[in-house]
């Protein structure tokens, strides 16, 4: 096989339908839109979700729940992620961000959770610490300071 013998797979190249280019093209005059009516007009058609006047699905289904504006949002970090730091390191949200343990600090700060094991002696200064995480940090000789 030579380069000049290469051909696209059958059916992969389809000719564009050129409409409104004369009667003999087969797609002239009404340009495949039929006669008059909503669908023949420019911009014709219905908006998304319109169901011909019957009550749309989005309005038939009951409303549920609400957005709690007082919800606390923390960036969560498990103690196993703190194992990478050296003994006596002061762990702050800024340090976690700088060391790429977390990708961003949420509006209410950082919360340390208790998954995994911790053997290093660390000083942890964050906004919130779970009970399990506090026990693991203190068991390894570290300190927890809630800021």
Swiss-Prot record:
Part of the 50S ribosomal subunit. Keywords: Ribonucleoprotein, Ribosomal protein, RNA-binding, rRNA-binding. GO terms for molecular function: rRNA binding; structural constituent of ribosome. Residues 42-52 have a biased composition (Gly residues). Residues 1-59 are annotated as: Disordered. Coiled coil: none annotated. Belongs to the universal ribosomal protein uL15 family. Pfam families: Ribosomal_L27A. It comes from the Bacteria. GO terms for cellular component: cytosolic large ribosomal subunit. One of its GO terms (biological process) is translation. Binds to the 23S rRNA. NCBIfam families: rplO_bact (TIGR01071). This is Large ribosomal subunit protein uL15.
